[in-house]
């Protein structure tokens, strides 16, 4: 049984109850939305994961990517990244490791967080293929499905799988004038496999078998966007939309099978086209939860892509995205370190709050009101507590403390609030 099959059978699970309480929404509404596929609760049956609801009418959620590379293999650092992610309010984590002993790294991350954990199995599939056959693109169906099953048994809560790349998708790509080609690493493995071997994508041709496997462990399928644009110049082009059409069809098959599913979206989109992308996805995928990387509305901010991501992410979430994948200052430059993780997460959480306020979320507005009252009352401790990052403003105030205890060192005795308050007392 999965969260979706239970919901379809009018069964309210403890995970649905938890999400309902967290969102301050009637649990029967949560059940109905899970049954229809509008909300997912990624939680593998083998793991004691903190339940998180992702979908329409819920708060915008934020994911943190972490993981090793072939150039930097430090399990302890990845564990610290996972701990920082939970400490600073991430809703989920993805282990994207490609260097070192991947099963051991995954095991340690699963052990050191209660958050839902996702993976991209194609990374491990490619490495196993290289070790066995000499190239990452020479994998066979046994390697693919054995890897997916093994990760499911380990407790992975959601998996990004590039099921929508087909021979027809690649024909569309080859006939397009796209500048950057395929920038998705997992998507590139599948694309190269199809082009070299002239075979169909096994994740597409064996999709029903894949669903049986995921259903057994209640792994949420995150349909990867292997044809996502890698730069603004390629946004909303035919390869991207062709794949999205296929993903919409696969969403229907997931729902029929009782497998929870969400859909991943583009990472580079000009600001004036963000809303269009969200509406296209929500229409083609029948309101499946939408998971976006950023998106980045400019490609010229290397070293500051957490800021561009927050700008694009706020508009994306306001326009329909439900799950924001953070972007760190290290994006497009190097592997992220712990400080990058913290900064990227905070920026993405700001975007989520901005969007939730704009959408009228009652919990988001309640926090804004609390902050207004705390500022009116010069309650600095409460302001720090309510801040998305409470540590930084505390340190900043300590670095240059005000002479007037209630004020800050910008206005001091000329604080507008204090001035009017004093005048009112006379």
UniProtKB/Swiss-Prot annotation:
Recorded superkingdom: Archaea
Presence of keyword Plastid: no
Gene: thiC
Pathway(s) of this molecule: Cofactor biosynthesis; thiamine diphosphate biosynthesis
Name of the protein in its database record: Phosphomethylpyrimidine synthase
Protein EC: 4.1.99.17
InterPro entries tied to this protein: ThiC, ThiC/Bza_core_dom, ThiC/BzaA/B
Coiled-coil parts of chain: none
Binding of [4Fe-4S] cluster, residues: 408, 411, 415
Keyword Cell membrane: no
Job description of the protein: Catalyzes the synthesis of the hydroxymethylpyrimidine phosphate (HMP-P) moiety of thiamine from aminoimidazole ribotide (AIR) in a radical S-adenosyl-L-methionine (SAM)-dependent reaction.
Family designation: Belongs to the ThiC family.
Pfam family, one: ThiC_Rad_SAM
The protein's required cofactors: [4Fe-4S] cluster
HAMAP family: ThiC (MF_00089)
Lineage, opening ranks: Archaea, Methanobacteriati, Methanobacteriota, Methanomada group, Methanococci
Residues annotated as binding Zn(2+): 268, 332
Protein's organism: Methanococcus aeolicus (strain ATCC BAA-1280 / DSM 17508 / OCM 812 / Nankai-3)
Catalytic activity: 5-amino-1-(5-phospho-beta-D-ribosyl)imidazole + S-adenosyl-L-methionine = 4-amino-2-methyl-5-(phosphooxymethyl)pyrimidine + CO + 5'-deoxyadenosine + formate + L-methionine + 3 H(+)
């Amino acid at each position: 049984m999965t969260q979706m099959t239970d919901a379809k059978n009018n069964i309210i699970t403890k995970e649905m109850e938890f999400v309902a309480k967290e969102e301050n929404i009637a649990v029967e509404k949560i059940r109905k939305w899970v049954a229809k596929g509008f909300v997912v609760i990624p939680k593998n049956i083998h793991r004691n994961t903190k339940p998180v609801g992702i979908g329409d009418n819920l708060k915008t959620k934020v994911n943190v990517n972490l993981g090793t590379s072939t150039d930097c293999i430090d399990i302890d650092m990845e564990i610290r990244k996972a701990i920082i992610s939970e400490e600073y309010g991430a809703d989920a984590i993805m282990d994207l490791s490609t260097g070192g002993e991947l099963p051991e790294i995954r095991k340690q991350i699963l052990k050191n967080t209660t958050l839902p954990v996702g993976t991209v199995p194609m990374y491990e599939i490619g490495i196993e293929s290289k070790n066995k056959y000499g190239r990452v693109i020479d994998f066979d169906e046994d390697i693919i499905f054995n890897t997916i099953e093994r990760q499911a048994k380990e407790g992975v809560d959601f998996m990004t799988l590039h099921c929508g790349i087909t021979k027809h998708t690649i024909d569309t790509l080859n006939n397009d004038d796209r500048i950057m080609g395929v920038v998705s690493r997992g998507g590139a493995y599948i694309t190269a496999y199809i082009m070299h071997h002239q075979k169909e994508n096994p994740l597409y041709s064996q999709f029903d078998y894949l669903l049986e496997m995921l259903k057994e462990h209640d792994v949420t399928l995150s349909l990867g966007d292997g044809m996502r644009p890698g730069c603004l110049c390629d946004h909303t082009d035919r390869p991207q939309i062709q794949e999205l059409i296929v993903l919409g069809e696969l969403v229907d098959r997931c729902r029929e099978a009782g497998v929870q599913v969400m859909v991943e979206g583009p990472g580079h989109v000009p600001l004036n086209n963000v809303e269009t992308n969200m509406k296209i996805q929500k229409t083609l995928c029948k309101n499946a939860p939408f998971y976006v990387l950023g998106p980045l509305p400019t490609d010229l901010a290397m070293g500051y892509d957490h800021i561009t991501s927050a700008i694009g992410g706020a508009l994306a979430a306001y326009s329909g995205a439900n799950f924001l994948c953070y972007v760190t200052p290290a994006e497009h430059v190097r592997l992220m370190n712990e400080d990058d993780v913290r900064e990227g997460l905070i920026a993405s959480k700001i975007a989520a709050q901005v969007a939730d306020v704009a959408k009228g979320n009652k919990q988001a507005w309640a926090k804004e009101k609390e902050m207004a009252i705390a500022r009116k009352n010069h309650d600095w401790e409460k302001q720090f507590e309510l801040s998305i990052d409470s540590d930084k403003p505390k340190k900043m105030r300590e670095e240059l403390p005000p002479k007037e205890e209630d004020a800050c060192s910008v206005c001091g005795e000329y604080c507008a609030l204090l001035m009017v308050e004093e005048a009112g007392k006379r």
